[in-house]
Amino acid sequence: MNSSARTRRDLPESPYLAAVNGRKPHRVPVWFMRQAGRSLPEYRALRAQHDMLSACFDAELVCEITLQPVRRHDVDAAILFSDIVVPLLGAGIDLDIVAGVGPVIASPVRTAADVAAMKPLERQRVQPIADAVRLLVSALGEVPLIGFAGAPFTLASYLIEGGPSRHHARTKAMMLADPESWHTLMEKLTDITVGFLRVQLDAGVDAVQVFDSWAGALSLANYRSYVQPHSARVFAALADYGVPMTHFGVGTAELLGAMSAALKPAPATVVGVDWRTALADAATRVMPGTALQGNLDPVVLLAGWPVVETAARAVVDDGRRAVDAGAAGHVFNLGHGVLPETDPGVLTELVSLVHSL
């Protein structure tokens, strides 16, 4: 076992860690993807003084932003504030995060020569992330900290497309037309993802979540052939840390079984489910012993409290049916990230409701 796993915090009262490890929590655990973000006025006040990338590389800012939703909402887990492209910066990729657009890659990776020129992650480039984790482990008390990284496929899409994409056409075309370069690229990105998560795990995160945001653009056959082996290597490389690992993508109903299989080496496995798939149905698609996370539609939070309450109760009930159907546990979350226009008061009330059920 990795030496850091032996010194990790012992959090026996954590509902989140109980649920993902297959134990019965004393309350339904809840946290939100993108809980640290533009829905919070305190976050917007900080970001008015710092651009996104500067914020991601300032350990004290990362700590403060990560803590904000824990203080405000009483969520059962914190997730490290970062951006999916931070490890690419750690590997020397020239990029920027453009307001209203997202990550923009200065020189997209589209040829075998581009792939060959890619460099590995340099740990010293992402040292502020490790520093932030250490600050958070000290500040969070009994609340677990979830580490964060993008999966190789989603990172590949940003690199190939040059930024966010609706159809991922260049990505899929390269994957199919030049599989040798594709797999070489994915191997390099797998190493980058593993390295970035090792930095966080060595600093003390209690769990990790790997976001394959764009995997839903793929067929099951293409996912299995071109993506799953690389994602599986991420989780296998980190299994000796002994922490729970979550695998999440959007629009991945047909991929849930394969995404769950990729997690298999991990000691405790969780699959994130979006709002398109019932949790009880997802429980029949994933590997035995897998916990589920999700899956309230983020848009529901804009529809007024009566709608939110009804939908939240339905998700909790569905989570219980999922456990009855074989899921190891259920963590209440959204099916994707909190929308910027979400009223933070609704999120606070939602946490209180879920805890009461």
From Swiss-Prot:
It is found in: Cytoplasm. Keywords: Cytoplasm, Decarboxylase, Lyase, Porphyrin biosynthesis. The record marks 83 as: Transition state stabilizer. Substrate binds at residues 34-38, 83, 158, 213, 336. GO terms for biological process: protoporphyrinogen IX biosynthetic process. Pathway: Porphyrin-containing compound metabolism; protoporphyrin-IX biosynthesis; coproporphyrinogen-III from 5-aminolevulinate: step 4/4. One of its GO terms (molecular function) is uroporphyrinogen decarboxylase activity. It catalyses: uroporphyrinogen III + 4 H(+) = coproporphyrinogen III + 4 CO2. It is an enzyme of class 4 (lyase). Disulfide bonds: none annotated. Its EC number is 4.1.1.37. Belongs to the uroporphyrinogen decarboxylase family. This is Uroporphyrinogen decarboxylase. The gene is hemE.
